């Protein structure tokens, strides 16, 4: 299966689940190119954004595991351009 570049946005409203989110992200570390976390304490949640490179199956597995956690919302997007079409 072809790898594609994409993004994942994670909104965490229950901070007690953060260790589990970090464990899942660590399990998928090979596909994570960049990660940015922003605490939004004044709004009562935290946001993590990821830039990833992986197959659609890998992305589905990652977002599925995160999305099943109480207090976590996940949205993802993959570029239409496939990896071999990207010029170096």
Regions found by a protein language model. Give the residues of each.
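Long, contiguous binding/interaction regions
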Residues: 1-88
